[in-house]
Amino acid sequence: MSEPQSWSVMASQMTSAQLIRVYLDGSMGIGKTSMLNEIPTHSLMGVPVLKVFEPMKYWRYYFTDLVTTVNDTCDRRRRGEFSLFQSSMIVTALQSKFADPYLVFHERLSSKCHRITGTRGNPSLILILDRHPISATVCFPIARHLTGDCSLEMLISMIIRLPQEPPGCNLVIVDLHDEKEHVSRLSSRNRTGEKTDLLMLRALNAVYSCLVDTIMYANHICPYSKDEWESEWLDLPWFDTSLATTFINEPRTDYRGSRVSLHHTLLAIFKRRELCAEDGSLSTTHAWILWGLLMKLRNINVERFNITGLSTTKCVESFMDTMSERLVTHMSWNDAFEIEADVLAYNKEMAM
């Protein structure tokens, strides 16, 4: 392993700093945080590694305990104590608060990420974040909708909040194919107010798997093939209760075709009569929303990371070994120093 380099030495060797930023994301209880805890402070090449942890302190102790309240709300809706309208309003408000820390940090970070230098660069800094804003604005809301805890109208309000993505985003979706192991990991966390909801777990796993295909689709079709997307949309079936059940419960396989079809993306969930004309075409506003979602996803470099059967140590080794294959972006050295200060402040106030 190379000796860790000091910031002053590195700054004197380069005219600008180069950043690799990676978001670790995936279903709850899958082992992301354990991985992040074990990732070293320097890479094998001696590059400093900064880690941004889950804002659990903000979620649990700033005002409302979001984790306990969202689970309690969904339980009460399923017991008939809340209507769908009532639970949707509460869940959406809570989900917005889950998203707030991610969105605030993302805004600060985005202003510092400039043009892409490609891959296999010589980074000055590696930044690894526990979840992307897409988790709280898209993935969890869709899963809550599929489980019947959030209405379609409230879901649309949430996905609009996904921010624009600056160049150089690397999104790693952690996947655990062994459901029994996944349930065991989630149960063993024993967090106050957290429950092992198998339906929600399956819905989340399905959504995250589909997210990868959605980003691949966006990378292919945006921004020049809007007509092709609209044509594919008309061929989609109406997304009804039976399709929702199939989406959640049937095992998904990684799409291996030459190009992902719209049918394999999260957008297929929005083929609803409430959003469309009689011929199936989207209303103008909803077409803007969904096309806008694709445009926001198209700058993301996405990869699946199957951790089935791997120890946490092996997961970390595999994750770090492929770091050179990820996108690198330019930034000023002042920006790099500011990122370090921001990470320290954020973790101190937000993380447990």
UniProtKB/Swiss-Prot annotation:
It holds the Pfam family Herpes_TK. One of its GO terms (molecular function) is thymidine kinase activity. It catalyses: thymidine + ATP = dTMP + ADP + H(+). One of its GO terms (biological process) is DNA biosynthetic process. Catalyzes the transfer of the gamma-phospho group of ATP to thymidine to generate dTMP in the salvage pathway of pyrimidine synthesis. The dTMP serves as a substrate for DNA polymerase during viral DNA replication. Allows the virus to be reactivated and to grow in non-proliferative cells lacking a high concentration of phosphorylated nucleic acid precursors. Homodimer. This is Thymidine kinase. The lineage of its organism: Viruses, Duplodnaviria, Heunggongvirae, Peploviricota, Herviviricetes. The gene is TK.
